[in-house]
Amino acid sequence: MCLELDNNLSDYFKACTYAYYSDYENFIKYYDNEELFDEDDLNFHLCIGIRNSYNFAVKMENSGLKLTSGILSSISARYIMSNKVCDFNFKYLPSGIWYPNVPTKETCIYLLEKDPKYSLVIKTICVLLGWDDVCDKCDKICTEVCFRLSIIFNRRSFCEEDTIYNYKIHENKNILEKVEKDKYLLPETILRNKDTTLEIFFKYNYTSKQSNIEQIIDDMLYTYIDYSQNTEFGPMDCVSVDKSVYYNMVSYKPYLDININTVEFNFLNSAYVLKHHKEYPDDLCKKAVLNLLVNDIYDSNFVSLYRPFYFYTYKTLNKYMVQKLLIDFPRQRYAILVNYAIMNITEDLENYSPDIDLIRIAYASGSIEFYNIMMNKAKKEGGMCQHLDFENEKYIFKYHKYEDVDFDNLHKNNGHPLLLRATHLNFP
């Protein structure tokens, strides 16, 4: 990667930045070996860089550095999510293999046949995506978070007979602690507190209290769809890295081909395309703007020039970004509200018509309050609208009478929309 950063930045900041962007050569140039064990931020950004790049994971495995267990677990996860299973995966069992993308069913079945312990992590994918055929091949074990998700997503049969464990990685060892079902794991209690579970699982916080602080990301069976909200880590959070690079990039030469996928899923390529936007087609610039928005960068000039159709990608927009976009671009409000449907945010829903796609996405995301509000409005008004043509990326308007809606198809849950947007091909 040919990314040049301002000389006044510290070597430590540069090491974290290059790790975050999966740039092995520059990471090696600026890091201090001792910091792999002492610095939380560096571990955190290494784990992100590894999960986002198969090539970076391979280089880190073969670097000769003494790596923390969280980093080793992230390398194992990246191999699996790229469907490149090897002996390494059976030495280091990852704690999460669904972020930033999921492996194929064939990869999951192969892992289960080779090592039944993979039931712990694959069962969670089954719950998220409704893979009942793969779930049948898993052992009757799951994690507490997976059990809670099975209740929230109305897939109780996936886990109802399972023995529940808390699972973590400590000093390169897999530690299982059996969890007894108590009143806090009763379905009614889980549903009453489902927002907390979804908040933990999908959006927030690598900074939970840990017995071994060096394991920043991968020591428990938690992984988060929106890792931009790492606010408790101070100045080295993801948002500050992205913003610093975007506004202070001295020069950059893309190391990946510039195309729809490498722009939508690679922040540096997005920044590069917009800095040379007159040389690229509008569709590519729209993907670049989207990548900036989900990384909390609102460049009003480019948002106005290249307004995307989709307003979510491998992560959702943060709540405040959604509110700003709703004010600035009211005609795109239903596309923007997809983020609320995914995150179960119900503010001001009374101001919007019930929308068939938002209802479907809310159902698939387990966003029950959002779903119920929209459905109740549809019943009261006698129908629901359709504002989005996802296939052709166009805004439309169609009205469906309530009695004409095919609710069996509407409630067909094909998995969480964020997970289904990404494939391993986007993570070189």
From Swiss-Prot:
Which keywords label this protein?
Glycoprotein, Plasmid
Residues modified by glycosylation: 8, 205, 344
Q: Could you confirm whether the keyword Glycoprotein appears in this record? A: yes
Q: Which domain of life is it from?
A: Eukaryota
Q: What does this protein do?
A: Not known.
Q: What else is known?
A: The presence of the two linear plasmids, termed pGKl-1 and pGKl-2, in strains of Kluyveromyces lactis confers the killer phenotype, i.e. production of toxin and resistance to it, to the host cell.
The name under which this protein is listed is RF4 protein
Which species does the entry assign this protein to?
Kluyveromyces lactis (strain ATCC 8585 / CBS 2359 / DSM 70799 / NBRC 1267 / NRRL Y-1140 / WM37)
